[in-house]
């Protein structure tokens, strides 16, 4: 696979809500547009993501907005609260950005916002970031994740050429959470039910008879099962690190702030445990 380029410094953009749509009982789409996205672009990677910057109640920031200046001038409890979301789609012709949100009632910040936001409202976003897209050099592709990875997996499937060899596994709570994806690849929807998150994914990947040739894998979602799937791919199947895009998007028992703070240490521990055995 080609070597990844250095990451560019993220830019701040302002998106205006164009429309919203409830895709499934627990997945809400918010489409952003407007002049504030005039220099935004997200057409390089299929795992592009943005950080939505939520302003704490009662706080306002000087214009032009500069997140680094805000962090220097404002007390920490008045900083924008970032929440990271994958880009489901970017349409450069009409300059519309689609973001999908998992809804868990009133829990969290981003989900409740997505459920209630109305067209015309504006929100600041930082980005995009990203580092993965299906490579034509791969003989076959493995895509596996939970609801949090569904937007990036769907974007990746839609970017693959017809006839590509793909094994795609997406774990959701039940059949009502399945979505239509514009791909000729077979998507295996795994229904979690009352099982722990990721358990069905682990079983499915372990049971998979790996095709011959070079695999490129995209595995994302809850950190616990991602760690175990990394062991399956890296240690048991001896996949090269450069062919793996694998990371915990979230972790049970942690909000995003706590997870992002502890993620470097978590990743270092996973590396120390698994790279010795690989």
What function would you assign to each model-found segment?
Residues 1-278:
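Extended, composition-driven regions rather than compact fold-specific motifs
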């Amino acid at each position: 696979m080609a070597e990844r380029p250095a990451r560019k410094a993220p830019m701040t953009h302002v998106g205006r809500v164009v429309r919203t749509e409830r895709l499934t009982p627990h997945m809400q789409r918010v489409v952003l547009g407007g002049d504030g996205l005039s220099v935004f672009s997200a057409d390089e990677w299929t795992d592009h993501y943005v950080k939505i910057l939520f302003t704490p109640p009662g706080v306002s920031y000087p214009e032009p907005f500069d997140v680094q200046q805000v962090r220097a001038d404002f007390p920490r409890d008045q900083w924008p609260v970032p929440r990271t979301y994958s880009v489901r789609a970017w349409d450069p012709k009409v300059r519309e950005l689609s973001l999908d949100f998992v809804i868990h009632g009133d829990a969290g910040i981003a989900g409740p916002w997505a459920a209630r936001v109305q067209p015309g409202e504006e929100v600041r976003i930082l980005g995009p970031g990203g580092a993965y897209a299906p490579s034509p050099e791969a003989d076959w592709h493995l895509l596996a994740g939970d609801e949090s990875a569904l937007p990036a997996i769907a974007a990746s499937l839609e970017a693959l050429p017809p006839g590509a060899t793909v094994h795609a596994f997406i774990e959701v709570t039940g059949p009502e959470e399945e979505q239509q994806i514009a791909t000729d690849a077979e998507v295996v929807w795994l229904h979690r039910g009352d099982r722990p998150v990721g358990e069905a994914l682990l079983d499915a990947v372990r049971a998979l008879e790996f095709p011959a040739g070079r695999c490129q894998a995209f595995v994302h979602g809850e950190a616990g099962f991602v760690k175990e799937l990394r062991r399956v791919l890296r240690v048991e199947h001896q996949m090269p690190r450069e062919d793996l895009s694998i990371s915990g998007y979230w972790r049970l028992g942690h909000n995003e702030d706590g997870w992002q703070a502890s993620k470097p240490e978590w990743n270092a521990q996973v590396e120390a445990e698994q790279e010795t055995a690989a």
